[in-house]
């Protein structure tokens, strides 16, 4: 299992557009990918799950990956979060 923690820096948090980008990125990997916020974990491949978390600016989030390409998945998702200016 791989994991990485981030602080959301986007002014509007993880709303529809960035949530869609994250779901699309997570869906490229065969590993299980989850995102955790305030103690609740959801499947990062589910747009409804991600949106249900209501992640705002300043939120501490953790992404977990587990499976055959877990390392590539965590690296790819980290790149998306940073490249899009969503989290650091």
From Swiss-Prot:
Gene3D superfamilies: HPr-like (3.30.1340.10). The modification Phosphoserine is found at residue 46. The keyword DNA damage does not apply. One of its GO terms (cellular component) is cytoplasm. It is found in: Cytoplasm. Residues 1-88 form the HPr domain. General (non sugar-specific) component of the phosphoenolpyruvate-dependent sugar phosphotransferase system (sugar PTS). This major carbohydrate active-transport system catalyzes the phosphorylation of incoming sugar substrates concomitantly with their translocation across the cell membrane. The phosphoryl group from phosphoenolpyruvate (PEP) is transferred to the phosphoryl carrier protein HPr by enzyme I. Phospho-HPr then transfers it to the PTS EIIA domain. This is Phosphocarrier protein HPr. It comes from Listeria monocytogenes serovar 1/2a (strain ATCC BAA-679 / EGD-e). The gene is ptsH.
């Amino acid at each position: 299992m791989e994991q990485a923690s981030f602080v959301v820096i986007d002014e509007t948090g993880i709303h529809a557009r960035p949530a869609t980008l994250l779901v699309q990125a997570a869906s490229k990997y065969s590993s299980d990918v989850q995102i955790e916020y305030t103690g609740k974990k959801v499947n990062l491949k589910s747009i409804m799950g991600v949106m249900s978390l209501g992640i705002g600016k300043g939120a501490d989030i953790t992404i977990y990956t587990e499976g055959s390409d877990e390392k590539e998945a965590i690296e790819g998702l980290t790149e998306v979060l940073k490249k899009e200016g969503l989290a650091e």
